[in-house]
Amino acid sequence: MAQQTQSEIRYLTPPSVDVKKKKYCRFKKSGIRYIDYKDPEFLKKFLNEQGKILPRRITGTSLKFQRRIAQAVKRARHLALLPYVTDMMK
């Protein structure tokens, strides 16, 4: 049987290539300048089930707004609008 080189291999269907969606900062896109710490339902989008703040690489926010989210979450925790730690928050 003859050896096929890499250029001779043909597929019936082309191999699927996973294309990652580009992450974007939702605050810059929608023009939000102030993150309200008194809105716990909005802040819960940036927390995991344990109540920890999700990192930028997951949420896609910019550094500037990630710092503002962290500050807003900490203020909401201090005012008892959000729990410090929890099990199955969502």
UniProtKB/Swiss-Prot annotation:
UniProtKB keywords: Ribonucleoprotein, Ribosomal protein, RNA-binding, rRNA-binding
Instruction: Quote one Gene Ontology molecular function term.
Output: small ribosomal subunit rRNA binding
| InterPro entries reported for this sequence | Ribosomal_bS18, Ribosomal_bS18_CS, Ribosomal_bS18_sf
Report which superkingdom the organism of origin falls in: Bacteria
Q: Extract the SUPFAM superfamilies matched here.
A: Ribosomal protein S18
Please state which protein family the record places this protein in.
Answer: Belongs to the bacterial ribosomal protein bS18 family.
Which protein, by its recorded name, is this?
Small ribosomal subunit protein bS18
